[in-house]
């Protein structure tokens, strides 16, 4: 019976700040999690999703019997790409009526499909590069990490399976059928199942995995390339190194540097209240890894002090707090790899040049050195009365556009836009060098909603002075808010929250008859 049904694997990818272009619903008297309202030209349409499809798996995890809120959360936490296994509506209803085990429905077909797939050519016929391996840090809850280990006949290595929905492994970014490359920094590609189980058991309450998903593993196999651990994605780790830029005050930087008796390297101590070090976000017990882009892990105390002095009136430190240091030590990864990864917007921590004026209206004061102030914002605007509630301005002869005349209580105000905000991206496309008319056209052609990456004037001047590219990953992620496609635009309890809490990446609507979420 199961062989008569043909589930489809749909892979969706989107840009930062955009949505997938579909609604995920549950409906009264209807089984399953339904795909609805697929937007024309959206990632959902391009991936082959159809109206009425039922979602069986998300990133390999079976979700048909899960609560709708958990299914929505799985999609949201997938970031900018997600793989859905779906079954068309008619087939789903027949399968349910005939009591077909939906969990087993796709197994043989998925394996056959995977074996048949070949890597597609990229631009100009070039082979697409393989994705990165990734580090996942798991801290046990109760007595479980929320996964099982398996071997596959005819394949080398150990794989992760039975990923528990909302369990430790899933929250850490583990996917079903991930190939296990390292356990706590030790390669296990040639280890037996029993040896890997022993290493996991001996890890105690926390463990670090270097993993490769099945698509990436197949890509490397077909291209006959090997994994490079130094290229691993670090973005899933809960604690990261920090880049701290400090400008010397009249009394110096305002901290002491000491050799830690139990900690390798030099650590920050006795930060003075109100000092430049405190304002820049430096913390007591931070471990110094690099100074002005150069590693100091092998230097003694005097060597690190000299490196800081050479910075003159400003220095840039790469530091780790105790949690981040513990995680990177467990993985046996150098924190300097963080600077080389795509997750760090500026890519390096070299000493910045002298401040230069921003292309837009120059400010009369130095940019603040408060690290928390140096963040762009992602703002998702839902049009009301055919207006977004702000004006777009530019200075003749200069690149860039900025926000003016934000209407109080309007869509722009609700989304967190402020006067003088500089427009960096429109729907994921960088527009800093685009002419004013082109930026206006992009916003107008967005339809009912638009996602803007913006930066306040002071923060913009800071990034320009440091030659730091402004990208969406630097901003706080968009959070769920009121329904963008609901039947009414009346204010809800969300409207009492601060502006940044109202910015939207997804929208939801619920009633006694249905519950749906725009993805």
Swiss-Prot record:
Q: Which GO terms describe its cellular component?
A: brush border membrane; plasma membrane
Query: Which residues in this protein are found as Phosphothreonine?
Result: 451, 488, 503
UniProt xrefs under InterPro entries: NHER (IPR051067), PDZ (IPR001478), PDZ_sf (IPR036034)
Q: Which residues cross the membrane?
A: none
The effect annotated for residue 20 to A is: Disrupts interaction of the first PDZ domain with SCARB1. Abolishes interaction with SCARB1
Asked whether the UniProt record includes tRNA processing among its keywords, one would answer: no
Where is this protein primarily located? membrane
Name of one Pfam family that matches: PDZ
Xref: SUPFAM superfamilies: PDZ domain-like
Please note every region of biased composition (Low complexity). Answer: 505-519
Membrane topology, as annotated: Peripheral membrane protein
Where do Basic and acidic residues bias regions lie?
482-503
> Where would you find this protein in the cell?
Membrane; Cell membrane
- What does the record say about tissue specificity? Expressed in kidney, liver, small intestine. brain, lung, and testis (at protein level).
Domain of life, per UniProt, equals Eukaryota
The PDZ domain, residue ranges: 9-90, 128-215, 243-323, 378-458
Region (Disordered) residue spans: 348-374, 479-519
| Residues with PTM Phosphoserine | 108, 148, 192, 250, 334, 348, 489, 492, 508, 510-512, 514
Q: What does this protein do?
A: A scaffold protein that connects plasma membrane proteins and regulatory components, regulating their surface expression in epithelial cells apical domains. May be involved in the coordination of a diverse range of regulatory processes for ion transport and second messenger cascades. In complex with NHERF1, may cluster proteins that are functionally dependent in a mutual fashion and modulate the trafficking and the activity of the associated membrane proteins. May play a role in the cellular mechanisms associated with multidrug resistance through its interaction with ABCC2 and PDZK1IP1.
Family according to the record: Belongs to the NHER family.
What the entry says about domains is: The PDZ 2 and 3 domains seem to be involved in the interaction with SLC26A3.
Q: Any further remarks?
A: Disruption of the gene was not associated with abnormal growth and development or redistribution of interacting proteins. However, a modulation of expression of selective ion channels in the kidney, as well as increased serum cholesterol levels were observed.
Subunit structure and binding partners: Interacts with PDZK1IP1 and ABCC2. Binds to the C-terminal region of SLC26A3. Interacts (via C-terminal PDZ domain) with SLC26A6 (via C-terminal domain). Interacts (via C-terminal PDZ domain) with SLC9A3 (via C-terminal domain). Component of a complex, composed of PDZK1, SYNGAP1, KLHL17 and NMDA receptors. Interacts (via PDZ1 domain) directly with KLHL17; the interaction is important for integrity of actin cytoskeleton structures in neurons. Forms a heterodimeric complex with NHERF1. Interacts with AKAP2, BCR, CFTR, SLCO1A1, SLC22A12, SLC22A4, SLC22A5, SLC26A6, NHERF2 and SLC17A1.
Report the protein name in the record. Na(+)/H(+) exchange regulatory cofactor NHE-RF3
Organism annotation: Mus musculus (Mouse)
């Amino acid at each position: 019976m199961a062989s008569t049904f043909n589930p489809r694997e749909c892979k969706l990818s989107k840009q930062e700040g955009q949505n997938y272009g579909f609604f995920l619903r549950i409906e009264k008297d209807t089984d399953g999690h339904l795909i609805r309202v697929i937007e024309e030209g959206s990632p959902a349409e391009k991936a082959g999703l159809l109206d009425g499809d039922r979602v069986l798996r998300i990133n390999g995890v079976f979700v048909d019997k899960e609560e709708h809120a958990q299914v929505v959360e799985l999609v949201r936490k997938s970031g900018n790409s997600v793989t859905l296994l779906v079954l068309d509506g008619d087939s789903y209803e027949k399968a349910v009526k005939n009591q077909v085990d939906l969990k087993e429905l796709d197994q043989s077909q998925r394996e056959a499909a995977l074996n048949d797939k070949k890597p597609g050519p990229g631009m100009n016929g070039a082979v697409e590069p393989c994705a990165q391996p990734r580090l996942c840090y798991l801290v046990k809850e109760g007595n479980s990490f929320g996964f099982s280990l398996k071997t596959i006949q005819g394949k080398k290595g150990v794989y992760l399976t039975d990923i528990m929905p909302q369990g430790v492994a899933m929250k850490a970014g583990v996917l079903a059928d991930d190939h296990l490359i390292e356990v706590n920094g030790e390669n296990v590609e040639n280890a037996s199942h029993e040896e890997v189980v022993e290493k996991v058991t001996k890890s105690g309450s926390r463990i670090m995995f270097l993993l490769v998903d099945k698509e990436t593993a197949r890509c490397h196999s077909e291209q006959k390339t090997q994994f490079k651990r130094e290229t691993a994605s670090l973005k899933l780790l809960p604690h990261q190194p920090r880049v701290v830029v400090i400008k010397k005050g009249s009394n110096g930087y305002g901290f002491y540097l000491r050799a830690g008796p139990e900690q390798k390297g030099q650590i920050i101590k006795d930060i003075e209240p109100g000092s430049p070090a405190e304002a820049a976000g430096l913390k007591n017990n931070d471990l110094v890894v690099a100074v002005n882009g150069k590693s100091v892990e092998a230097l003694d105390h005097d060597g690190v002090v000299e490196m800081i002095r050479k910075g003159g009136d400003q220095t840039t430190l790469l530091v780790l707090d105790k949690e981040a240091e513990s995680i990177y030590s467990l993985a046996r990864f150098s924190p300097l790899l963080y600077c080389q990864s795509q997750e760090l917007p500026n890519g390096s921590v070299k000493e910045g040049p002298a401040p230069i004026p921003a292309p837009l209206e120059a400010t009369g004061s130095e940019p603040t050195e408060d690290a928390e102030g140096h963040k762009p914002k992602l703002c998702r605007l839902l049009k009301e009365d055919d207006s977004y509630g702000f004006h777009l301005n530019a200075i003749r002869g200069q690149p860039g556009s900025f926000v003016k005349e934000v209407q109080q209580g309007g869509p722009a105000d609700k989304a967190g836009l402020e006067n003088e905000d500089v427009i960096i991206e429109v729907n994921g496309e960088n527009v800093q060098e685009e002419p004013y008319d082109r930026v206006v056209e992009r916003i107008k052609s967005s339809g009912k909603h638009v996602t803007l990456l913006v930066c306040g004037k002071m923060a913009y001047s800071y990034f320009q002075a440091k030659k730091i590219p402004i990208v969406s990953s630097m901003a706080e992620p968009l959070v769920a808010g009121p329904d963008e496609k609901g039947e009414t635009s009346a204010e809800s309890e969300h409207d009492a929250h601060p502006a940044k809490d109202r910015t939207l990446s997804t929208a939801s609507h619920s009633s006694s008859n249905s519950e749906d979420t725009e993805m």
